[in-house]
Regions:
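Long, polar/Ser/Thr-enriched low-complexity segments
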Residues: 1-120
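Glycine-rich loops and low-complexity Gly/Arg-rich segments
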Residues: 33, 42-44, 50-53, 83-86, ...
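Charged linear interaction tracts used for macromolecular binding and regulation
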Residues: 90-236
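Low-complexity, polybasic segments enriched for Lys interleaved with small residues
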Residues: 233-247
Length: 248
């Protein structure tokens, strides 16, 4: 705000002019945002910023869609790591110009194997065979055999485990999602349970997802310690792995 410093003296900004203490006058500079949007030398920066912003939106959408599963298996850098992965997918768009590239589900392969908890890997925890496939409105996980005693590397103090399986369908244009429902999960089981054979878990959507949607299936495991009939998450969930094992 301009201030009058004498009979004729003015210091500050009036309209588009800046009056300085030494008596000099200059035009008010354009805002940083306006300069950023128009400067030719910042074209590449604007393009990168646009695609980074879109990647962040995609990352949040996926995290929101899997919020329940992620709540027990994530790390402090999940948002930035997933945004980086989404940025990689956007970079595979060979149709739109730089700065206008978008997510194409046909380029979603870089998301396969993404680990939501960097401190706990699927490959170092789950040693039993399984397969995740999709058809129509269903994403299915099949487990030929699972012996909890030998096939799960449970951290010390674990008494029970819970196999996590979830799926979501994401509309990357409208930024909306639909969650599938697993009708018959295995539930929480003792780590010394008898071996399981030929198990099938089915995550069903209300209807088959649109072809353009990103469909994601995640697999993980939660560890618990039972005390007086109650199940307590082990190590504040820091040892629970969760990874994307299906994309379409």
């Amino acid at each position: 705000m301009a201030q009058q410093t004498g009979i004729l003296g003015i210091r500050g900004t009036v309209g588009g002019l800046v009056f300085r203490k030494d008596g000099s006058i200059s035009q008010k500079p354009a805002s940083n945002r306006a300069a950023f949007q128009s400067a030719p030398g910042l074209a590449r920066t604007r393009e990168n910023a646009a695609e980074f912003g879109l990647s962040a939106k995609y990352s949040k959408l996926l995290r929101d869609s899997l919020r329940v599963a992620i709540a027990s298996a994530s790390d402090s850098r999940l948002a930035s790591r997933l945004t980086k992965a989404m940025r990689e997918v956007i970079g595979l768009d060979d149709t739109n110009d730089r700065g206008q590239r978008v997510f194409d589900s046909s380029n979603s392969a870089p998301l396969l194997g993404f680990n939501f908890n960097a401190g706990a890997g699927i490959g170092q925890t789950m040693y039993f065979p399984y397969e995740v496939t999709g058809a129509g409105a269903d994403v299915t996980m099949t487990i030929p055999a699972l012996n909890p005693v030998s096939d799960i590397a449970a951290p010390q103090g674990t008494t029970h485990f819970e196999l996590v399986f979830a799926a979501s369908s994401l509309d990357m244009e409208m930024l909306t999602f639909t969650n599938a429902v697993v009708a018959a999960p295995l539930g929480i089981l003792p780590v010394n349970s008898p071996a399981l054979v030929n198990q099938t878990l089915v995550a069903s959507f209300p209807a088959a997802p649109a072809d353009a949607n990103l469909v994601v299936g995640v697999v993980g495991i939660n560890f618990y310690q039972q005390v007086n009939g109650k199940f307590y998450p082990l190590n504040n969930n820091s040892t629970n792995p969760l990874a994307i094992e299906y994309v379409a």
